[in-house]
């Protein structure tokens, strides 16, 4: 990976690998071998979360990769996320320590607040990961909101940096208004914003704001609908892979649609975290550093924007968890 875009700088001077492996929905039995395969292909960035329920398996994969001697711990960038039920300052450190334990690590490269969603605390011994329902066995289970100021959660996140548990802290699923507010009181400024971002949801203003504020942006779901069709959160006809415009660009460069989407993401200055369970797709997804898109083709993809958000708690909260919980409105 000789391309200068193979990593992007973050505010503390670190280098953020621009293609990572997202681990959402990857089964436990796959990860212990998939992660070493990814490392052997050049991956150094792995995106995890408590809520994915597979951090112990990710940890086995990381341990296997380190044992193989291909990389050292210092070569890797491991991200995890604070879940919605742990926002109260009393629970933030314990949640981080649980992720560290599951991942077999002493320190995270990045710890993010997963959603601006504050749900009632569920003890580890009662259910872990706790998920979205407060009581899944209730007659009509739902999410249980509690009031926890985001500033209080952020203060506890800052203490994780002070304590050496994490190198950097950041946020997910925020817009410019909440970012401005956070920046006004943050002692340690957010290093990274992770949001849904793909050719059908380009979020140009949000990206520009973050770049001007020295906040790195991670694009999750860089292929758009593909992760959401099986969950009934997207229609099959919304697939980016069937889009004639991007297919035409892919043919022009002799690349796949997925490679074009990832190159666009990296070339516009974001980090992308595609998910896959196959070695062939792992290899395809990281082979994007041997070409560049023209300004015209970058603009064509920018103009594919439909403001189509697939991961929206206002929709899936009500459909799946019987709770209307808008955060983007």
Specify the residue positions occupied by each region the protein language model found:
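CE4/NodB-like, metal-dependent polysaccharide N-deacetylase domain
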Residues: 92-113, 160-163
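Beta/alpha (TIM)-barrel catalytic core signal, keyed to glycine-rich beta->alpha loops juxtaposed to Asp/Glu
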Residues: 84, 118-329
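Structural motif corresponding to the early beta-alpha repeats
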Residues: 77-90, 112-118
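Aromatic/hydrophobic pocket-lining residues that form the small-molecule binding cavity
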Residues: 31, 92, 96, 150-153, ...
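Hydrophobic faces of well-ordered beta-strands that scaffold small-molecule active sites
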Residues: 17-22, 46, 76-80, 108-113, ...
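Short histidine/acidic/glycine/proline-rich micro-motifs that form metal-
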Residues: 25, 52, 82-86, 196-199
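Acidic (Asp/Glu)-rich catalytic clusters
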Residues: 10-11, 59-73, 100-104, 183-186, ...
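N-terminal binding-site loop/beta-alpha segment at the start of enzyme catalytic domains
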Residues: 1-76, 89-94, 159, 222-226, ...
